[in-house]
UniProtKB/Swiss-Prot annotation:
InterPro entries: DUF4634. Keywords: Secreted, Signal. It is found in: Secreted. The keyword Disulfide bond does not apply. GO terms for cellular component: extracellular region. It comes from Homo sapiens (Human). Residues 1-16 form the signal peptide. GO terms for biological process: epithelial cell proliferation involved in renal tubule morphogenesis; phosphatidylinositol 3-kinase/protein kinase B signal transduction; response to wounding. The keyword Signal applies. It comes from the Eukaryota. This is Uncharacterized protein C1orf54.
Amino acid sequence: MDVLFVAIFAVPLILGQEYEDEERLGEDEYYQVVYYYTVTPSYDDFSADFTIDYSIFESEDRLNRLDKDITEAIETTISLETARADHPKPVTVKPVTTEPSPDLNDAVSSLRSPIPLLLSCAFVQVGMYFM
């Protein structure tokens, strides 16, 4: 019990000692004061400009229209032979519409089954394993 009593009083004295060879710092050297300034801009001098350039949208629409453009022939009448005295019955051709050919993604998605592709990949892997 006496040891505990001595320890309780001795620890604050040991920790709180000041050493004579220690240099003392002045208060102005001890505290480092840093000032931070925040600059808030004033937007009163600027006028708001909310104009939108629609030329990008127009060119995109034009490109989309060209992609989906359907060429139509005007309905014409064609005579298969040179003109005779008696005019034969003319042949009437209806307009032909064409659409762009499907790209590679459409062709791949129209495959019936991926099983042959998977089997061939599996055979290649097994062959590489046994080599």
